[in-house]
């Protein structure tokens, strides 16, 4: 980012500046962060980053707020069900800091559309998407463009937020998603990747959601993403993915301040 927004943010972020200092706050104010996936993890990443003074966001997600998001996603309320997550998050960000610039992309990131995103303009990338295909493509693009990236590993089917850790992907253990990511990244020659993962053994869901979900809260006929058609819907609680999101945001802030 090129503009200097630090002075305008002084009063709102004065307590943060007491810890980070003015130079760091200026860096944050002039940083552009792309958050891929505005869900249980990504929503809290955005929340903490805007409250920390980040000056520009790119929000990428094709989903709309669903009734089943109410148990854990910071953007989910009865009033926002049915609306695009990116649009709701943008409104929330601007309510917190109207001086922030927010760019929204109502689409799902895939290798096929990777070139549509201005990676060279990002100062940091947060991977909070669910699918391995998208995560791998995102990491590869970030490495190609030499943009710092941090990836969220599995936060579903877990109950203990205290077991999240920050590590290189090749030093992770227990997490099934991290295991797959290690294998796929090794094939592609990726030597390192900062991730947030949990060492908690995943809890087996008490019910088969793929069979029992019949709410059809906003899933219209023919929709690409329908709860009733997903093979495996993980269990979730409010106090786990939120922790992962806040840890990720902390890493982003610290890295941007050191840059």
Mark where each language-model region is.
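N-terminal charged helix/coil linker that caps or initiates catalytic domains
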Residues: 1-34
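Glycine-rich phosphate/adenylate-binding loop
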Residues: 2-6, 120-121, 134, 144, ...
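Conserved N-terminal Rossmann-fold NAD(P)-binding element of oxidoreductases
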Residues: 35-37, 60
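Hydrophobic/small residue at the entry helix of a nucleotide-binding pocket
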Residues: 41-42
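Glycine-rich phosphate-binding loop and adjoining beta1-alpha1-beta2 segment
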Residues: 54, 59-97
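Conserved SAM/SAH-binding loop
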Residues: 106-114
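Short, well-ordered coil/turn residues at beta-beta hairpins
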Residues: 128-129, 152
């Amino acid at each position: 980012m090129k503009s200097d927004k630090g002075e305008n943010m002084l009063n709102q972020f004065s307590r943060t500046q007491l810890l980070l200092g003015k130079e760091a706050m200026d860096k944050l104010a002039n940083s552009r962060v792309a958050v891929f996936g505005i869900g249980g993890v990504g929503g809290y990443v955005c929340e903490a980053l805007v409250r920390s003074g980040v000056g520009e966001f790119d929000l990428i997600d094709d989903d709309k707020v669903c009734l089943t998001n109410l148990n854990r996603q910071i953007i989910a309320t009865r009033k926002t069900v049915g609306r695009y997550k990116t649009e709701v998050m943008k409104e929330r960000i601007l309510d917190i800091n109207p001086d922030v610039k927010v760019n929204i992309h109502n689409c799902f990131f895939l290798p096929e559309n990777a070139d549509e995103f201005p990676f060279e303009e990002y100062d940091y990338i947060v991977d909070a998407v669910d699918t391995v295909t998208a995560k791998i493509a995102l990491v590869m693009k970030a490495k190609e463009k030499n943009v710092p990236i941090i990836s969220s590993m599995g936060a579903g089917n877990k109950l203990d937020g205290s077991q999240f850790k920050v590590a290189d992907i090749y030093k992770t253990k227990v997490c099934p998603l991290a295991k797959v990511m290690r294998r796929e990244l090794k094939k592609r020659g990726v030597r390192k990747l900062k991730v947030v993962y949990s060492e908690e053994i995943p809890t087996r869901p008490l019910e088969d959601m793929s069979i029992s979900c019949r709410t059809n809260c906003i899933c219209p006929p023919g929709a690409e993403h329908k709860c009733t058609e997903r093979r495996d819907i993980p269990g979730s609680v409010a106090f786990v993915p939120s922790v992962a999101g806040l840890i990720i945001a902390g890493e982003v802030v610290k890295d941007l301040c050191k840059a």
